[in-house]
Amino acid sequence: LLPNVIHVSARCVASHALNIFGDHSDVYACRQTGYAMLAETNPQEVMDLGAVAHLSTIEGRVPFINFFDGFRTSHEIQKIEAWDYEDLREMVNMDAVNAFRARALNPEHPVLRGSAENGDIFFQHREACNRYYDALPEIVEKYMGKVNEKLGTNYDLFNYYGAPDADRVLIAMGSICDVAEEVIDYMNASGEKVGLIKVRLYRPFVAKKLVEAIPASVKKIAVLDRTKEPGALGEPLYLDVVTALASCGVSGIKVIGGRYGLGSKDTPPSSVFAAFENLAADEPKDHFTLGIVDDVTGLSLPEKDCPDTAPAGTIACKFWGLGGDGT
């Protein structure tokens, strides 16, 4: 229970080959560590929710991994509204800060840490941390509320975007959410009813809050994971969503899963269109892949040329560069 925040630009963990680029496999590998996990979509959210991570860890006494997509978000050059330290100061729980400082190692009030325990008491002590994790989501919500009040944002543990009466919904976290929003705007303007749930607080995963974010009209959900776990029944976020719905007694919603963006593979609007088109089928393909052509196991979804979903007046430029040439 040592408050700290590790800011992570999430990257690929080497498997059959080294890859230094972006996906979520390194973050998913940390699930058992007990770190809380907060996810962001773009540089502005990194600024805003990074503050939430620091404020929450001080009060909640649970360490945080605050993560965002490697390269796609971490290297994006973007204009943002930067925070001033005075903005943070007025939100900090100084009583919690002073209590944290008082727990520092000090010969005047020695404590025992890093002990070894046998089977007679280890299990009991391992469970003793439960109350801190149970209390943490409410603390995160509180500081998200403070940020919302200051900035006029609407950050929540799970944010829904799209038609209020959507019948098909994607669940994802990271930079794909901005792409999905453009596609959703286009599809809904064309008479479709689709939406997206953006996962903010990935750990602790609050099942009740996820269910509350899902419109009552939803019939099908596709969960998009940016990793691959060979041999598993599904990737981590997919399994979390399925478990959350089951634990809350939700039935009547078909849930499928898919993989995308491994090793910084691009996920353009055409991939998001393909995911929604797959959901519209009577029997959607499960455990699918996006953005590649899988001619070995046939798991990839076919992608078509898609309309331009960028806002009107957008000017697009492409720069070519390699390594350290300054591009």
Give the label of every model feature segment.
Residues 15-21, 48-51, 75-82, 86, ...:
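Short acidic, glycine/serine/threonine-rich loops at helix termini
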Residues 220-310:
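Peripheral docking tails and interdomain loops at the edges
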